Amino acid sequence: MKFTLLSTAVALLTSTAVALPTSSSSAGSLLNERSYVNASSTATTCPYSRRSPAYCAGTAQNRTLSATYICGDSRLGPVVLPQFFLPLDPILDIYDRFGGLCPGAFLEKWFNQTGSGWWDYPPQNGFSVDDEGNIIAANLTLQTGTFVDRFGSEYGSFLAPAAAPYLQRSLPPSNLNGDAKFPWNYHVYSVIKPFAVLAGPIAPWFGQPGQGVQYQTYENVATLIADGYLKAEDPQRLVPRNY
Protein backbone atom coordinates (compact mmCIF):
# COMPACT_ATOMS: atom_id res chain seq x y z
CA MET A 1 0.00 0.00 0.00
CA LYS A 2 1.37 3.38 -0.99
CA PHE A 3 1.17 6.49 1.14
CA THR A 4 1.45 10.05 -0.07
CA LEU A 5 2.47 12.89 2.22
CA LEU A 6 2.09 16.23 0.50
CA SER A 7 3.70 19.38 1.85
CA THR A 8 0.25 20.86 2.37
CA ALA A 9 -0.72 17.84 4.44
CA VAL A 10 2.25 18.26 6.75
CA ALA A 11 0.84 21.48 8.14
CA LEU A 12 -2.57 19.86 8.45
CA LEU A 13 -1.22 16.95 10.47
CA THR A 14 0.44 19.20 13.02
CA SER A 15 -2.92 20.62 14.07
CA THR A 16 -3.93 19.25 17.46
CA ALA A 17 -7.03 21.29 18.29
CA VAL A 18 -9.88 23.22 16.80
CA ALA A 19 -10.83 26.46 18.55
CA LEU A 20 -14.16 26.52 20.32
CA PRO A 21 -16.42 29.57 20.15
CA THR A 22 -15.68 32.06 22.91
CA SER A 23 -19.25 33.30 23.23
CA SER A 24 -22.71 31.80 23.45
CA SER A 25 -23.69 33.15 20.03
CA SER A 26 -23.15 29.84 18.20
CA ALA A 27 -26.26 28.16 16.86
CA GLY A 28 -27.74 25.92 19.53
CA SER A 29 -30.71 23.89 18.40
CA LEU A 30 -30.05 21.28 15.76
CA LEU A 31 -33.46 19.68 16.03
CA ASN A 32 -34.39 20.88 12.54
CA GLU A 33 -32.49 19.54 9.54
CA ARG A 34 -30.21 22.16 8.00
CA SER A 35 -30.16 23.11 4.32
CA TYR A 36 -26.36 22.94 4.43
CA VAL A 37 -25.00 21.31 1.26
CA ASN A 38 -21.50 19.85 1.23
CA ALA A 39 -19.05 18.20 -1.10
CA SER A 40 -20.39 14.65 -0.71
CA SER A 41 -24.11 15.36 -0.71
CA THR A 42 -26.45 16.22 -3.52
CA ALA A 43 -27.82 19.70 -4.07
CA THR A 44 -31.30 18.56 -3.01
CA THR A 45 -32.99 18.55 0.36
CA CYS A 46 -35.61 16.19 1.75
CA PRO A 47 -39.01 17.51 0.59
CA TYR A 48 -40.81 16.22 3.68
CA SER A 49 -40.95 17.70 7.17
CA ARG A 50 -40.40 15.45 10.14
CA ARG A 51 -44.13 15.60 10.85
CA SER A 52 -44.97 14.10 7.47
CA PRO A 53 -45.76 10.34 7.40
CA ALA A 54 -43.58 10.12 4.28
CA TYR A 55 -40.50 11.41 6.11
CA CYS A 56 -39.67 8.03 7.66
CA ALA A 57 -40.38 5.89 4.58
CA GLY A 58 -37.65 3.31 4.09
CA THR A 59 -36.55 3.28 7.73
CA ALA A 60 -37.07 0.70 10.48
CA GLN A 61 -39.66 2.99 11.99
CA ASN A 62 -40.46 2.18 15.62
CA ARG A 63 -42.92 4.57 17.22
CA THR A 64 -42.00 3.42 20.74
CA LEU A 65 -38.49 4.83 20.17
CA SER A 66 -39.52 7.93 18.23
CA ALA A 67 -38.71 10.24 21.14
CA THR A 68 -35.18 8.84 21.32
CA TYR A 69 -34.10 8.29 17.70
CA ILE A 70 -35.07 9.90 14.41
CA CYS A 71 -37.98 7.80 13.06
CA GLY A 72 -37.43 5.51 16.05
CA ASP A 73 -34.48 4.02 14.12
CA SER A 74 -31.21 3.98 16.09
CA ARG A 75 -29.19 4.06 12.87
CA LEU A 76 -30.36 7.63 12.29
CA GLY A 77 -29.05 9.00 15.56
CA PRO A 78 -30.69 10.81 18.47
CA VAL A 79 -33.61 13.20 18.08
CA VAL A 80 -32.07 15.65 20.52
CA LEU A 81 -28.67 17.11 19.74
CA PRO A 82 -26.78 19.53 22.02
CA GLN A 83 -28.37 22.89 22.66
CA PHE A 84 -26.24 25.33 24.65
CA PHE A 85 -24.22 22.35 25.89
CA LEU A 86 -20.49 22.99 25.73
CA PRO A 87 -18.25 21.76 24.25
CA LEU A 88 -20.59 19.76 22.01
CA ASP A 89 -22.83 22.55 20.77
CA PRO A 90 -20.17 24.18 18.53
CA ILE A 91 -18.76 20.77 17.51
CA LEU A 92 -22.14 19.88 16.01
CA ASP A 93 -22.96 23.32 14.64
CA ILE A 94 -24.19 23.34 10.97
CA TYR A 95 -24.23 19.52 10.97
CA ASP A 96 -26.70 18.18 8.40
CA ARG A 97 -26.96 14.56 9.48
CA PHE A 98 -28.41 13.20 6.21
CA GLY A 99 -26.50 15.34 3.74
CA GLY A 100 -29.68 16.69 2.17
CA LEU A 101 -31.41 13.30 1.85
CA CYS A 102 -34.53 11.95 3.49
CA PRO A 103 -33.77 9.31 6.16
CA GLY A 104 -34.77 6.34 3.99
CA ALA A 105 -32.70 7.56 1.04
CA PHE A 106 -29.74 8.12 3.36
CA LEU A 107 -29.94 4.52 4.60
CA GLU A 108 -30.31 3.21 1.07
CA LYS A 109 -27.13 5.01 0.04
CA TRP A 110 -24.91 4.40 3.08
CA PHE A 111 -26.22 1.33 4.93
CA ASN A 112 -25.54 -2.21 3.67
CA GLN A 113 -28.93 -3.82 4.14
CA THR A 114 -28.19 -7.16 2.48
CA GLY A 115 -24.50 -7.77 3.17
CA SER A 116 -22.80 -6.73 6.39
CA GLY A 117 -26.00 -5.35 7.90
CA TRP A 118 -24.04 -2.28 8.93
CA TRP A 119 -22.69 0.95 7.51
CA ASP A 120 -20.69 0.97 4.29
CA TYR A 121 -17.57 2.62 5.65
CA PRO A 122 -15.17 4.39 3.27
CA PRO A 123 -12.21 2.60 1.68
CA GLN A 124 -8.63 3.22 2.85
CA ASN A 125 -9.87 3.47 6.45
CA GLY A 126 -11.42 6.82 5.68
CA PHE A 127 -8.22 8.63 4.67
CA SER A 128 -8.25 10.99 1.71
CA VAL A 129 -6.30 9.84 -1.34
CA ASP A 130 -4.30 11.61 -4.02
CA ASP A 131 -5.07 11.62 -7.75
CA GLU A 132 -3.41 8.21 -8.11
CA GLY A 133 -5.40 6.64 -5.29
CA ASN A 134 -2.60 6.70 -2.71
CA ILE A 135 -3.48 7.41 0.91
CA ILE A 136 -2.48 10.85 2.15
CA ALA A 137 -1.13 10.03 5.60
CA ALA A 138 2.02 9.83 7.68
CA ASN A 139 3.18 8.57 11.04
CA LEU A 140 2.89 11.26 13.69
CA THR A 141 3.76 11.19 17.39
CA LEU A 142 1.10 12.63 19.67
CA GLN A 143 2.90 14.49 22.42
CA THR A 144 2.19 14.60 26.15
CA GLY A 145 -0.54 17.10 26.97
CA THR A 146 -2.33 16.83 23.62
CA PHE A 147 -6.11 16.56 23.84
CA VAL A 148 -7.92 14.20 21.47
CA ASP A 149 -11.47 12.89 21.27
CA ARG A 150 -13.80 10.45 19.58
CA PHE A 151 -17.49 9.71 19.12
CA GLY A 152 -17.55 6.01 19.86
CA SER A 153 -16.58 3.34 22.36
CA GLU A 154 -13.06 2.75 23.67
CA TYR A 155 -12.78 -0.34 21.49
CA GLY A 156 -12.25 1.78 18.40
CA SER A 157 -8.92 2.88 16.97
CA PHE A 158 -9.61 6.35 15.56
CA LEU A 159 -9.14 9.68 17.32
CA ALA A 160 -9.37 13.31 16.24
CA PRO A 161 -8.01 16.64 17.45
CA ALA A 162 -10.23 17.61 20.38
CA ALA A 163 -13.30 19.66 19.44
CA ALA A 164 -13.00 19.16 15.67
CA PRO A 165 -16.39 19.77 14.00
CA TYR A 166 -18.47 16.62 13.58
CA LEU A 167 -19.08 17.25 9.89
CA GLN A 168 -15.30 17.11 9.29
CA ARG A 169 -15.13 13.57 10.72
CA SER A 170 -17.34 11.83 8.10
CA LEU A 171 -19.14 9.70 10.71
CA PRO A 172 -22.64 8.20 10.51
CA PRO A 173 -25.34 9.68 12.76
CA SER A 174 -25.48 6.54 14.94
CA ASN A 175 -22.09 7.48 16.40
CA LEU A 176 -23.98 10.15 18.35
CA ASN A 177 -26.04 7.57 20.26
CA GLY A 178 -24.86 7.96 23.84
CA ASP A 179 -26.04 7.25 27.36
CA ALA A 180 -26.31 9.03 30.70
CA LYS A 181 -22.59 8.63 31.39
CA PHE A 182 -21.42 9.70 27.93
CA PRO A 183 -23.99 12.03 26.33
CA TRP A 184 -23.88 11.84 22.54
CA ASN A 185 -21.19 9.13 22.85
CA TYR A 186 -18.50 11.79 23.23
CA HIS A 187 -15.16 10.91 24.84
CA VAL A 188 -12.19 13.19 25.50
CA TYR A 189 -8.64 12.04 26.30
CA SER A 190 -5.30 13.61 27.12
CA VAL A 191 -2.00 12.10 26.04
CA ILE A 192 0.01 10.97 29.07
CA LYS A 193 2.89 9.32 27.20
CA PRO A 194 3.81 10.05 23.57
CA PHE A 195 2.70 7.44 21.05
CA ALA A 196 2.65 7.08 17.28
CA VAL A 197 -0.45 7.25 15.09
CA LEU A 198 -1.14 7.27 11.37
CA ALA A 199 -2.48 10.75 10.70
CA GLY A 200 -4.07 12.29 7.66
CA PRO A 201 -7.04 14.19 6.20
CA ILE A 202 -10.47 12.55 6.24
CA ALA A 203 -12.29 11.72 3.01
CA PRO A 204 -15.85 12.94 2.40
CA TRP A 205 -18.39 10.23 3.31
CA PHE A 206 -21.84 9.72 4.84
CA GLY A 207 -22.99 12.96 3.21
CA GLN A 208 -20.37 14.95 5.10
CA PRO A 209 -17.49 17.00 3.66
CA GLY A 210 -14.79 15.48 5.87
CA GLN A 211 -11.34 17.09 5.49
CA GLY A 212 -10.68 17.09 9.21
CA VAL A 213 -7.72 15.15 10.62
CA GLN A 214 -7.96 11.60 11.91
CA TYR A 215 -5.46 9.67 13.99
CA GLN A 216 -5.53 5.91 13.41
CA THR A 217 -3.98 4.22 16.43
CA TYR A 218 -2.03 0.97 16.39
CA GLU A 219 -3.92 -0.28 19.48
CA ASN A 220 -7.50 0.43 20.41
CA VAL A 221 -8.28 3.25 22.81
CA ALA A 222 -9.01 0.90 25.72
CA THR A 223 -5.51 -0.61 25.41
CA LEU A 224 -3.89 2.83 25.19
CA ILE A 225 -5.65 3.79 28.42
CA ALA A 226 -4.69 0.56 30.17
CA ASP A 227 -1.06 0.97 29.09
CA GLY A 228 -0.89 4.55 30.38
CA TYR A 229 -0.74 6.42 27.07
CA LEU A 230 -4.17 8.04 27.28
CA LYS A 231 -6.24 9.35 30.17
CA ALA A 232 -10.00 9.87 29.99
CA GLU A 233 -10.94 13.49 30.67
CA ASP A 234 -14.11 15.41 31.46
CA PRO A 235 -15.22 17.08 28.19
CA GLN A 236 -15.73 20.27 30.20
CA ARG A 237 -11.95 20.68 30.19
CA LEU A 238 -12.32 21.86 26.60
CA VAL A 239 -14.49 24.80 27.64
CA PRO A 240 -12.55 28.08 28.07
CA ARG A 241 -12.19 28.95 31.75
CA ASN A 242 -13.55 32.46 31.30
CA TYR A 243 -16.66 31.29 29.42
Curated annotation (Swiss-Prot):
Deletion phenotype, per the entry, is:
Does not affect the growth of aerial hyphae, conidiation or conidial germination.
Naming one, the record's GO cellular component terms include: extracellular region
**The TNT domain, residue ranges:** 141-231
Q: Give the organism, scientific name.
A: Neurospora crassa (strain ATCC 24698 / 74-OR23-1A / CBS 708.71 / DSM 1257 / FGSC 987)
Q: Which residues are glycosylated?
A: N38, N62, N112, N139
Q: Spell out the post-translational modification annotation for this entry.
A: N-glycosylated.
Q: What is this protein called?
A: Conidial surface nicotinamide adenine dinucleotide glycohydrolase
Q: What triggers production of this protein?
A: Expression is up-regulated in mycelia grown in a zinc-deficient medium. Expression is strongly induced with the formation of aerial hyphae, accumulates in conidia and decreases very fast as the mature conidia germinate. Induced by the presence of proteins in the culture medium. Low concentrations of sucrose or glucose, Casamino acids or some amino acids such as methionine, cysteine, phenylalanine and tryptophan strongly repress the expression.
Q: Which domain of life is it from?
A: Eukaryota
Q: Tell me the first and last residues of the signal peptide.
A: 1-19
